[in-house]
Amino acid sequence: MILPDFSLARVLVVGDLMLDRYWFGGASRISPEAPVPVVRVESSEERIGGAGNVALNLAALGGEVDLLGYAGEDEAAAALERLLAVAGIRSHIERCPAVATITKLRVVSRQQQLIRLDFEDGFAHLDPAPLVTRFRALLEETGVVVLSDYAKGTLACVEEFIAASRRAGKPVLVDPKGVDFDRYRGATLLTPNLSEFEAVVGACCDDAEIERKGRALMTRLDLEALLVTRGEHGMSLLRPTAGALHLPAHGKEVYDVTGAGDTVISVLAAALAVGRPLTDAVALANLAAGIVVGKLGTASVSPEELAIAIHGQRAPRRGAITLAELLDVLIPLRRAGERIVVTNGCFDLLHPGHVHYLEQARALGDRLIVLVNGDDSVRRLKGAGRPVNPLPHRMAMLAALESVDWVVAFDGDTPRDEICAIRPHVLVKGGDYADITAIVGHDCVLETGGEVRILDFVEGHSTTRIIEAIRNG
């Protein structure tokens, strides 16, 4: 898996804006007025909450973020705007003097939350027209829309936001709230957690039931995809015309799940905004969720942390391996959404043309597998005197290349059996083939939804020419 350049992402987040306030202090006695602790406040902190936390996650990834929502004409709104400016988030706040900015005040002592005080009026009764007008003006410049619903009223007219996004050709991702999912009809992707999903479709006892009920929900709501986040059980991606993708959780230690859903939808949106396929975006979001649940409190994930997670996910052994070993290695990589590329050849005398070709092949995916003809196979194909280099030498040379992940030998005249067993996402062959049907293994790859690519060889480089030059002195 390759980490995208999130700085190229531009995402519009719409939802319920909140200010999170914390008062920290010691509690060493009980009040004489009532049986409650007395907290001596020693410090305070303000943080961006609600839909703003999605925007904060996107900004932490390095993306460009526009945030749209309601706030009051009060001190809390001013504090929220200051925090958003510091985070590099472009805020488009519709000020409403008649309501208070949603504020959640938490009193914390010795890392324990003693009480939470909520200040809110809700926005459902407000005229949505000004907000919808601002939304439409922002749509043109954005790549992906995120609707973050906390059921406070900002998305009371969520249908209008979805319809406008679809007309503009913008993917719209929704983090839903409540049991009325019909409000989100026509969205590109919904990201409910398992509890939210089961509240709508009923309890699910296994993956098969999640898939069955999820597909029915997608059909009913005209969704392009559904991602159910399942805590310690990972997440499940469902699409109408593809098999279910069940990804295991990556978190080794779970300290706090606060805000994990915000992290998931922000990484999804950023990856899609830079053109990554949905399966890649989900794999990245799953990695990010595993990172963020290992942190205390509402947190975000940086590109550096994702890069470390991706690197740590690499198979422990690269290089020359057997087909059976390779098939075992590929299982978790497929679950993580990695794109597998396969090519094949004799590679008798490795030259710059080979190196360039293999680099081109690797660029088509996340992992490159090279299938190499055994010595007898080369002899039958090339004639007496070949190969010049025996199989172990050829495999060692290929395995030393940075572009190559694994090298597997085959003894037959063609690698069709190996290609069919691997089922790569991309089968690559070099040369002047007029039609991909002439390429061995093309049928297996196409039947499993893969693609076949033909790459040009670099002119002026040929193993045969090198051998002739050596023989001619």
From Swiss-Prot:
In residue numbers, the region (Cytidylyltransferase) covers 342-473
The annotated active site, in chain numbering, is D262
One GO CC annotation: cytosol
The enzyme's E.C. designation: 2.7.1.167, 2.7.7.70
Its Gene Ontology biological processes?
ADP-L-glycero-beta-D-manno-heptose biosynthetic process
CDD domains given for it?
RfaE_like (cd01172)
Q: Which Pfam families match?
A: CTP_transf_like (PF01467), PfkB (PF00294)
Q: Is ATP-binding among the key words of this record? A: yes
* Entry's Gene Ontology molecular function annotations: ATP binding; heptose 7-phosphate kinase activity; heptose-1-phosphate adenylyltransferase activity; phosphotransferase activity, alcohol group as acceptor
Q: Which UniProt keywords apply?
A: ATP-binding, Carbohydrate metabolism, Kinase, Multifunctional enzyme, Nucleotide-binding, Nucleotidyltransferase, Transferase
Q: What class of enzyme is it?
A: transferase
Which pathway does the protein contribute to? Nucleotide-sugar biosynthesis; ADP-L-glycero-beta-D-manno-heptose biosynthesis; ADP-L-glycero-beta-D-manno-heptose from D-glycero-beta-D-manno-heptose 7-phosphate: step 1/4; Nucleotide-sugar biosynthesis; ADP-L-glycero-beta-D-manno-heptose biosynthesis; ADP-L-glycero-beta-D-manno-heptose from D-glycero-beta-D-manno-heptose 7-phosphate: step 3/4
Q: Please state which protein family the record places this protein in.
A: In the N-terminal section; belongs to the carbohydrate kinase PfkB family. In the C-terminal section; belongs to the cytidylyltransferase family.
The name under which this protein is listed is: Bifunctional protein HldE
Q: Which organism is it from?
A: Methylococcus capsulatus (strain ATCC 33009 / NCIMB 11132 / Bath)
